[in-house]
């Protein structure tokens, strides 16, 4: 994963260099990554893991998966709200005449990248569930999937001799495809373990604690 990350960074600088587009992409990618650290890999996961573990021990996988569905539904609704509001605000900012060019480009690219937040935060919760039932391979491979997707997008842009202004959007698409795969692959693995996605609106004791 680290080698692929290094290759990705090398390709990013080979294609975008120290250009305005590179700075704008880094700025845009910071926002979903911040939410990933706060929601996907931060406080929320730290709160969910012990509760999921307790339910898994007391009620087995059926109860644990029900709790997981409760968490995923509420997280999905929260993320949809923030992504929707964020995209509207970013579209307005990117079209504002008073915004510096770099910030305007960053806001425009962030409109493309903000949905990545949806994929990666949901993926983090599912991966936490997989880890707790002893499934480690797929969660560990998710960063590799993102790097491969971004590398593929950059290579495609280079192969087509695209300009930096076009390659940066290829890179955004690569991030979105990678994020979708980061959610899809753990979901498939969890489905094989007996999980079934359900819309569970009721809040049990564990959700109240959470």
Give the predicted meaning of each segment:
Residues 1-210:
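Membrane-embedded alpha-helical bundles of multi-pass transporters/translocases
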């Amino acid at each position: 994963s680290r080698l692929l990350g290094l290759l990705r960074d090398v390709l990013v600088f080979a294609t975008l260099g120290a250009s305005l587009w590179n700075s704008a992409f880094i700025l845009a990618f910071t926002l979903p990554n911040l939410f990933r650290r706060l929601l996907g890999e931060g406080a929320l996961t730290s709160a969910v893991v012990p509760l999921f573990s307790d339910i898994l021990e007391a009620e087995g996988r059926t109860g644990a998966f029900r709790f997981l569905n409760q968490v995923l539904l509420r997280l999905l609704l929260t993320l949809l709200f923030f992504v929707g509001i964020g995209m509207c605000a970013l579209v307005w900012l990117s079209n504002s005449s008073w915004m510096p060019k770099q910030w305007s480009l960053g806001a425009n690219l962030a409109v493309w990248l903000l949905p990545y937040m949806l994929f990666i935060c949901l993926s983090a919760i599912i991966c936490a569930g997989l880890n707790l039932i002893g499934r480690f391979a797929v969660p560990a491979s998710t960063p590799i999937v993102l790097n491969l997707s971004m590398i593929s997008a950059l290579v495609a842009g280079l192969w087509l001799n695209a300009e930096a202004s076009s390659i940066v959007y290829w890179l955004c698409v690569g991030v979105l495809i990678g994020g979708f795969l980061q959610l899809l692959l753990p979901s498939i693995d969890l489905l094989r373990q007996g999980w079934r996605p359900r819309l569970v609106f009721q809040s049990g004791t564990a959700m109240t604690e959470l």
